[in-house]
Regions:
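Active-site neighborhoods and metal-handling regions in enzymes and metal-associated proteins
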Residues: 1-173
């Protein structure tokens, strides 16, 4: 890469319950949400991973992963933006965490890190072949913690996840 696509977001512990947490000098706790991207020849990437270390965090992480998989399954030319959002949101709601999914399921990106369309329930329009979007559902429990998994997806008949980094990363704090 030539440089970062945006300022990296690192949030841990209860601060991870805010999707765009500001940096602090607080001691690192778990989970740790890291959102970063690279810029290459003017084009951006955008990825988020969450490092977890408890059964409760893993339970939430698994729900978010299931929601992301369902969203990615729907990504294809001609599919409504709102339908991609609904696929992720329905999974999270089925587990009783719907009120804690507080942002859109994704967004387009390219020369800028956030481009239209947003992939949300309010978005009108349909996916077009060769768009590049994120799939990034999350659950954010105020005062406790948050979990987000974000990958970049190329819209095709059989859409392709462009992110190659493992979703679940082992670590010791």
């Amino acid at each position: 890469s030539n440089k970062p696509a945006f300022d990296t977001i690192v949030a841990s512990g209860s601060r991870s319950s805010s999707p765009h947490s500001e940096t602090s000098m607080n001691r690192v706790e778990t989970p740790i949400v890291v959102d970063w991207g690279a810029r290459y020849d003017h084009y951006c990437s955008d990825i988020t991973r969450t490092f977890i270390d408890s059964e409760r965090q893993e339970e939430i992480w698994n729900i978010v992963l299931e929601a992301q998989k369902e969203a990615i399954k729907t990504i294809s030319p001609g599919v409504k933006f709102a339908d991609v959002d609904k696929a992720a949101r329905d999974v999270i709601s089925e587990y009783g965490y719907g009120e804690y999914f507080i942002h859109s399921t994704g967004h387009a990106f390219g020369l800028d890190i956030h481009e239209n369309p947003n992939i949300s329930s309010k978005s009108e329009g349909v996916l077009e072949e060769n768009m590049v979007i994120t799939a990034e559902p999350g659950i954010y429990i105020p005062g406790e913690f948050g979990v987000r998994i974000e990958d970049d997806v190329l819209v095709k008949k059989n859409s392709e996840v462009l992110t190659s980094l493992d979703k679940k990363l082992d670590f010791t704090l």
